[in-house]
A protein has these predicted regions:
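Flexible coil/loop and intrinsically disordered segments
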Residues: 1-406
Length: 406
């Protein structure tokens, strides 16, 4: 009965109002305005319509099929077409040497110059290329004929970068991959580049924990990448003397990066997908445990890096807020090497002095890792420079050309 009432109402009470528009832009504007209470058009929807109407004949059918495949692959890689266009904007800005700190809106950026950037023949191909990268980062997939995707050290560095507090790490990684993925020595150079990027970003955030601290540096790096596969990291100099203290008592947003960096030094596998930051000395303690120390000092010390471990969520729930001797059994069962070693150690008591000693060990270890990465990157930079002809060599080449010898 209800269905007949609906049909009657639709035929006799609904009003069909035709709306015509002189251009597609006008039609899209009208649709967005009338549809504000429904599901609004995304930038990707508008870009799809623009590209489709720019094509002719069978190219339209091919485009629709490729767009559908792009959407499916992006979703499977935990990304979206909307996000891919945003990432790609930074690649195009790098090609255009645009290092302005103000990030334009995606729709505004692509709509400039009559949507010319959308009509570039390589657009869809490069969006598919980006998805390949995210398949590795987000899903842990191994790509056919791309050996770097099974390189555990590269995957560990990428995993550590995913814990960076904002998305600025993504843009140079994407640009580097698009530009050089087919090069002969890509795997080695990509590994060193990623380590160098992580070293710069982590160091900067430890000392200046704000989003804008690296924005300008990253934009300059993006432009440098499209010119060279050994780009110069023109990051501002930092006070290295403050780094040790910053590692020992880090901002909460950088703790996961530090723990991953430390953990990956000691194992050749990724951390489990679900792990938590474990406080060795519990956040809730008995007030009579430290009679001579103020609660504020204890609370501050508990948050030091020396009191923290990466720990599987299930084991962490079992360990609870128990004291060290009681939690060692769960630590020993961990598949995270540095946590397991702590559980198998002969240490029976954990106190503020223990935290201070481990603070020093961890900061020394992290600083050593950062120095190693910087040195490895500088080595390939020097190799490139040493392989270039000197002024004397160039003069000889010019002389030989003039004489017709070459």
């Amino acid at each position: 009965l209800m269905i007949y009432q609906f049909i009657y109402s639709l035929l006799n009470q609904a009003i069909l109002l035709p709306i015509t528009a002189d251009t597609q832009d006008t039609a899209l504007t009208i649709f967005s305005t009338l549809n504000d209470r429904g599901l609004p058009l995304s930038d990707a929807d508008i870009f799809k319509a623009k590209i489709y109407n720019h094509l002719e004949g069978k190219d339209k059918e091919i485009f629709i099929e490729r767009w559908k495949e792009l959407d499916e692959q992006a979703t499977a890689a935990n990304e979206s077409i909307q996000q891919l266009f945003y990432y790609y904007m930074f690649y195009l800005r790098a090609l255009e040497k645009d290092t302005k700190s103000t990030t334009p809106g995606v729709r505004k950026y692509y709509s400039s110059n009559k949507f010319a950037r959308l009509y570039q023949s390589e657009l869809l191909d490069n969006l598919f290329v980006m998805i390949e990268l995210w398949k590795v980062i987000n899903k842990g997939e191994v790509l056919e004929d791309e050996s770097w995707s099974s390189n555990i050290k590269i995957k560990q560095t990428l995993d550590t970068l995913t814990s960076y507090p904002n998305e600025f790490w993504k843009y140079p990684v994407i640009i580097y991959y698009i530009c050089y993925r087919k090069d002969k020595n890509f795997e080695d150079k990509f590994a060193r580049f990623l380590n160098k990027l992580l070293a710069e970003l982590m160091t900067k955030y430890i000392l200046i924990p704000t989003i804008n601290a690296v924005k300008g540096d990253i934009l300059k790096l993006n432009s440098a990448i499209v010119v060279s596969d050994i780009p110069k990291f023109d990051f501002k100099e930092l006070d290295q003397a403050q780094l040790e203290a910053g590692i020992q008592n880090p901002h909460r947003n950088v703790v996961r990066m530090l723990l991953k960096t430390l953990a990956y030094k000691h194992q050749d596998s990724l951390l489990p997908s679900k792990w938590e930051i474990e406080h060795i000395f519990p956040q809730k303690w008995q007030t009579n445990y430290f009679i001579d120390e103020s609660d504020n000092k204890i609370r501050e010390k508990i948050e030091h890096i020396g009191n923290k471990l990466p720990f599987e969520k299930k084991l962490n729930i079992i360990a609870g807020n128990g004291y060290f001797a009681k939690k060692k059994k769960e630590y020993a069962a961990s598949k995270i090497e540095i946590t397991k070693v702590m559980g198998l150690s002969e240490i029976q008591e954990w106190n503020l002095e223990s935290i201070s000693k481990r603070d020093i060990r961890i900061s020394d270890s992290i600083i050593a890792i950062l120095k190693k990465w910087n040195k490895e990157y500088s080595v390939i930079t020097k190799e490139i420079v040493s392989n270039k002809p000197s002024d004397e060599d160039l003069a000889r080449i010019a002389e030989f050309k003039e004489k017709g010898w070459i």
